[in-house]
Amino acid sequence: MLSFNKFRPQGVVANLFNQTRPTLIAPDTFISTRSYSIFQKTLDDPLRTSPTCFAGKTVLVTGANTGLGFEAALKSFGLHAKHVILGVRDVEKGEQAKQRILQTMPQIPLSLSETTRDGNPTSQRISVRKLDMSDYDSIHNFVNELAAKDGPLDVAILNAGVFGVKYEPLSKYGWENDLQVNVLSTALLSLLLLHAKAIKPKTGVLEFVASRRMRTVRLTEEEKNAPSLLEVFNRKQEKFDASRQYQVSKLLLVAFYKSLATRSANLVQGSPIITAVCPGFCQSNLSRGHQGFAADVLRAVLNTFVLRRTEEGARTLVTGTIPEEERHGRFWYDDELHDVMLPDNVGDTQQFANKILQDVITAIQCDTSVPVV
């Protein structure tokens, strides 16, 4: 039987990888079997669109003015959400994103049978809120405003993240940028949302956007035995490995999430569903720091032949928010639900996760108040 996928550009590349696989993933080469399988899955399987409807629901998306966050916000609006909140660092860019959503879907009603509810015009169904993930005060203010103005959320998609090209000057709190935004600030935001009861219990969903490639991280014995992995990867490296730093930040985030999900009942009575998703290899603006002709050419090739479209990657962010109890503490990717699997060499995974959670909370407490789990 002919496979339609073979006639897609991605399918052609997949077939080429099938033919050359023994060479590409031979022992001691830079492409691991696990990396290959993730890459192959991205090439072969388009993701399904969301089977859910957000009618009557309030949805928060952070990092929502561009990339995956924008597409997730657009989809939420298109699924008839009562209220979509865009959490953005730059309010002006957030307002521009809001206008793009309204222009793209000007006639989307609140539900399949009505065009307004409570007399609210369509434009009032999207709010833009300032959220600077490098500033703890901004995160506190953001959550306080949510709790005061919006009532409990039905869905919170914690998408905001960075991928540093080089070792950035330390944040105001003394942390490398990937660690600050992807780990510490995201952790603080999640804890404050839970503590403020800003997400509906039991049926609400708190979603972390992660990366399953964090499983490819191989910690050295020195790193594993260090008092704090945060401190280890906060040091200025002689040769900064941007890709490894990003994956380490996602490893720490997933470890934090894994521990948080097991303890969430201690934080608020009737916890929301806490889950994590991975959109796979897809086009986004995370690589915007890579500049120059070579970077532009590589980006064009990857975008054309390899990566999922941003819209397709955002489908995972939306389908991951289906409020099912079995999603709590698990990992959604490629339209399937998986157990959270950390790298093989971290030892006892729950013990590792619990230690990371405590390290993260300790680091945040040096600079701001944070709920204790």
What are these regions (language model features)?
Residues 1-41, 236-243, 281-312:
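Alpha-helical membrane-targeting segments
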Residues 30-285, 370-371:
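Rossmann-fold NAD(P)H-dependent dehydrogenase/reductase core
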Residues 135, 252, 309-312, 352, ...:
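An acidic site on a long C-lobe helix of protein kinase domains
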Residues 197, 321-325, 364, 368:
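Short, hydrophobic alpha-helical segments
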Residues 218-222, 286-291, 342-346:
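Short aromatic-enriched loop/helix-cap "lid" or pocket-rim segments at secondary-structure transitions
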Residues 257-261, 318, 357, 361:
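Non-transmembrane alpha-helical segments in soluble domains
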Residues 300-342, 350-352:
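C-terminal helical subdomain
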Residues 355-373:
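C-terminal helix/juxtamembrane-tail motif
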